[in-house]
Amino acid sequence: MAEPRMPRPAISPTRDKSHSPYRESPSRRLRDVETGYNPPQNPPYPPQRNGTEPYPPSPSSRTADWEPIMSNPNPMSQSDLGRKKSLIRPERNRIDRDHPNYYYRKHAANMEVLPSTTGNDPVVEDLAEHRTVSSGSTQQDTSIEEEVVGNPQKSRMPGKLEPVGKKKAPRKLVRKDTRNLTEEEKRRQKELDKIKPPSIWNIYCAVVTFWAPDCLLQCFGMPARAQRRAWKEKVGLISIILLIAAFVGFLTFGFTQAVCAAPGLRLKINHVDRSYMIFHGGAYNLDGSMHPAARGIPLDANVLYDLPHKYGGQDGSFMFQKVNGACKGLITLAEGSDVPTNSDGDLAWYFPCTAFNQDGSSEVNLTSPYYLGYACHTTAKARNTFYSLKKAGDVYFTWDDIKNKSRNLAVYSGSVVDLDLLKWFNKSQVAWPQQFDDLRENGRVRGMDLTHVLQSATDKQVGRCLTQIAKVGSIDTESVGCIASKVVLYVSLVFILAIVAAKFFLALAFQWFLARRFAAAKTSQTSDPKKRAKQIEDWTDDIYKPAPKITDPASTVTGSDGRTSKRGSMFLPQTSRFTSPYAVDRRSSRPPPTTMTSQSSNAKLLPGGNPYKSGFNSSQNTLDLHSRMSVGASRSSLLLSGQETRYSAVMDNLDPNGPVGFIHENVVPQPPPEWQPFGYPLAHVICLVTAYSEGEDGIRTTLDSIATTDYPNSHKAILVVCDGMIKGKGEAQSTPDIVLGMMGDFVIAPEDVQAFSYVAVSSGAKRHNMAKVYAGFYDYGPKSRIDPTKQQRVPMMVVVKCGTPDEATKSKPGNRGKRDSQIILMSFLQKVMFDERMTELEYEMFNGLWKVTGMSPDFYEMVLMVDADTKVFPDSLTHMVSAMVKDPEIMGLCGETKIANKNASWVSRIQVFEYFISHHLSKSFESVFGGVTCLPGCFCMYRIKSPKGGQNYWVPILANPDIVEHYSENVVDTLHKKNLLLLGEDRYLSTLMLKTFPKRKQVFVPQAVCKTTVPDEFKVLLSQRRRWINSTVHNLMELVLVRDLCGTFCFSMQFVVFIELIGTLVLPAAISFTFYLIILSIVKKPVPVIPLVLLALILGLPAILIVLTAHRWSYILWMGIYLLSLPIWNFVLPAYAFWKFDDFSWGETRKTAGEKTKKAGLEYEGEFDSSKITMKRWGDFERGKLDQRSSVCGILVETNLCHLFRTASSGERKCLEPATSYASTERLRFYAWVRTLP
């Protein structure tokens, strides 16, 4: 239970980093990234020691080989210890309550460490002996030891260094004294709370719901203020979802129409029919026109059909010439010209006023039929009539038309100019610049764009002039808006395809290459992956179907793994008579992974027979009679570390009922640390099962599966937390009675167990809760489905939340929710690791675990969380621990959950493929980056603490104060918090872990499998998915703000989380757009090919994933059923969940007897009275126990200690000599050993 300490920057002699078999943490550098700690460059004190006593070694070294820890094996200069070329300045970070390490720093500030000038590990100060402390031990402060043994020397020895940190009182229990607020201070605080300005979110919700005042909502059944606030926040969220959906719909369908409106009628050159006439590049429909009377034209004649010359389909631009515009000054009047002009030099026309063919085939005709200027329409009336005509459309040319060698065409600013029209100039009438002739006769200009050629001012005027007098059409181009819409379309297409393809291929790479690294080298199941997969599929057909028996001897833990054998092993000897029989895989020069047990290699085992010396015990540590007697005879801990422990001064003086003084006679002994049946060092695991209203069959199935896993029982313990005195619907017994009926060999008889107080996760008076702790062993029952030869003895502890006496008569006494059940364990682990004050309940949990396991709870490194209706495959726990041990950066993982009632109804059938794809696609993809965003609470594992830096240094993970503090939040006053903490607490824990430790990993281990029953009624599925979808949305909102996740910008987990959040919010809109697109492609032409291809890829890739990863073709059928049910998954369920944002109840999921569905999280009753809860450190509880007894086990309380001897005649123990002087640790251990003698 040692506090976590900083890692040493120098290389530890017991742990060579250069030969590590597993990936080293990138954060292993001088600065501890997770705590933000930086060693001081110039420490205020030089290192000093009292006396000449050397420093002790690490737990894995021998006593004779002790070397000073402060000695540096690799001397480094002072300059080498500083940070080099780093842009990170963690010391400049503002450490407020939002900082991920805020609470950890507060707890670490109470650590007493000495400064170091060498950069080595800080030394924990001990006033009795200068010893380092393993976090695997439980060290009690020396001041407590002095009080127990009566040592009057409590003053600090001269020359002792003051610990780094704050000035502390003489007592060792250092806490900030809580100061009672006066009435005036409370009043001021209330006033400050009242004048707190509203947030932007609250203002937005008030604006959106202005039409629904509080008085109106009260009339509609919302009397509570919390209900009205939740409803307004719900409307605010729905409005944002609608805005996002509208934006997505606009990008999908409206953006193209907005920026690229459908162009008007466009007529291709040479395809303009006889009902049109062309003027200046535009086509005019003159089919119903009537011309006034003129020479050669009768009244109301149609110029297209009624005249001798048929003008239909011809270009009449010369009849309405654009003169005196850009061409003024360029085209001038020729000498002797008959063209009318005025004083300003304006000309009446430039060309003969006649029509020509649109294909440019007309010959030049400079004559006029009646008079000069005939058909030039120079009068204002004629011009106004022409300008009033509506253009039917533009005449366009393609580039192929422009490059046609039969014509002399060029392009200027998008307009097509026919340079051959310049031949129609009459030299006798007008004069034009020579540049016109040069352009017309230059063959290199033909078919070119002259826009960038004519760049000077004069050239630009020439270009504009040509456009006015010789324009015959426009180039076939798209508008900027249309180009932009296509760019957006293709960029979106590439972007979506990249995400889908990356997700698919990375998930496939994880399944094929990366996942196998997590698995154990050998387990109790078959070593053939295909055969094992088939066994799992058969096993998941029924929830009560037992696991397959071991049929492959080569795959058992006692067999050899052929894949690990080497060809050269048959020629050269690999062992000798001096080789340890427990050593496993020592052929590699690389050190094994670090666990608490591997660091305690000098631990002393129980006296008597050791079942592990004879090889693997097929019954998984079930001892014979002789071994039981040996265990029962021992009255000390099974694992006594060679180091002095934090509790050594107290635990050696306990009474027979204390944690060390009494160990259950059926306790499972601890094997040697070298014993590695699965190819990796074993780690201790707590299997947490949270029970609420489950029935006897469900709980029995879960506990049977955990108890019969092939992981050694010496390294696992079952902890069941019953959430209140609850009776499930249709059950004859309450859940606590059902669970207690599955226990045996109680440490204390159930009727004698007392209820103890603790601080619950709730508000008001419900923060005080009481619970009972039952410790014993799992009982399979007389009608067990488990073969008696397979029944193993597993330590088990049950915590029953029974509630305070005030709520005994109320419904569901003691019920505080699943999060409170998890916090009971998490808070307990934090108190154990930091040696902090604990409640009476936590103290009893400490003693209960010690008595049924024979070891300190600080040895546990991992927590397996399983729901009480889930059944675990036998080797799943082995694979999960294997991943944790092999990669210390993994802080959480989950296995695959399979459905056991696939064919119960259509509701269960549509969920089969959804479960499959969520694991093998989503979680596999996220595991590549180590950022699985959701570890299902029904089957997951978290790391309690992780090795960090040098030997014996650990940092809290699940037991981290920041995790415990945030997860135990009891002020749940906003819609966001309620969806996080009341509906999706399991997912929020995963989110919290990623927020606090963004550089660590959460992965999916496909080898670990469990099965469960899913809802087979639609109303239950609707209620379950409402909770899941709403919690997913709010958890993704939390994660999207974490900037330290793996990757950068679009190639980061933060971006992936953002895409998932948007995708979740627009699910109803997306499925609606999909069906609209399919219908549109059927009834309208042309078919939108690109969106349909994209849709086919998104829906079809999972089928390929099934072929490549699944082991049954039946999943193709399940996929078809899932696709048919897409409207339910993507529309009905999300839309219902969004509308129920303000519903915080569990609905129809797990109802109890007589319960009515109601909204939760809205009412708080009474005030919390903290005086009802006693909190002390473990040593204070033990001293109090000693003070309550006059004489226990030969220890006199009046003298605190006495020398023990036994008489040879009667064998009874007798106190002969009180101890009045300081007793050494060895002497205390000797007395403890004497007390264990029969």
Curated annotation (Swiss-Prot):
Biased composition annotated in UniProt, kind: Polar residues: 71-80, 133-142, 553-562
Catalytic activity, as annotated: [(1->4)-N-acetyl-beta-D-glucosaminyl](n) + UDP-N-acetyl-alpha-D-glucosamine = [(1->4)-N-acetyl-beta-D-glucosaminyl](n+1) + UDP + H(+)
Top-level EC class as recorded in UniProt: transferase
UniProt keyword terms in alphabetical order: Cell membrane, Glycoprotein, Glycosyltransferase, Membrane, Transferase, Transmembrane, Transmembrane helix, Zymogen
Gene Ontology terms: cellular component: cell septum; plasma membrane
Transmembrane segments: 200-220, 235-255, 487-507, 1062-1082, 1087-1107, 1115-1135
The UniProt record lists the keyword rRNA-binding: no
Biased composition (Basic and acidic residues): 14-34, 175-190
Lipid bilayer topology: Multi-pass membrane protein
GO function terms (MF aspect): chitin synthase activity
UniProt region (Disordered), positions on chain: 1-93, 132-190, 548-570, 582-606
Residues bearing glycans: N50, N180, N365, N404, N426, N617, N903, N1030
Gene Ontology biological process: chitin biosynthetic process
Domain of life (superkingdom): Eukaryota
Coiled-coil region(s): none
Post-translational modifications reported in the UniProt record: Maximal activity requires trypsin activation, suggesting a zymogenic nature.
Disrupted-gene phenotype: Leads to reduced chitin content, abnormal yeast clumpiness and budding kinetics, and increased melanin secretion. Does not affect virulence in an acute mouse model. Also leads to increased expression of the other chitin synthase genes for compensation.
Temperature curve summary: Optimum temperature is from 30 to 45 degrees Celsius.
EC number of this enzyme: 2.4.1.16
Summary of activators and inhibitors of this protein: Activity is stimulated by Mg(2+), and is more inhibited by polyoxin D than by nikkomycin.
pH dependence text: Optimum pH is 7.5.
Function: Polymerizes chitin, a structural polymer of the cell wall and septum, by transferring the sugar moiety of UDP-GlcNAc to the non-reducing end of the growing chitin polymer. CHS4 synthesizes a large amount of chitin and appears to play a role in the process of cell separation. CHS4 is particularly well suited for functioning at the higher temperatures associated with its poorly characterized saprophic environment and with human infection.
Protein name per the record: Chitin synthase 4
The encoding gene: CHS4
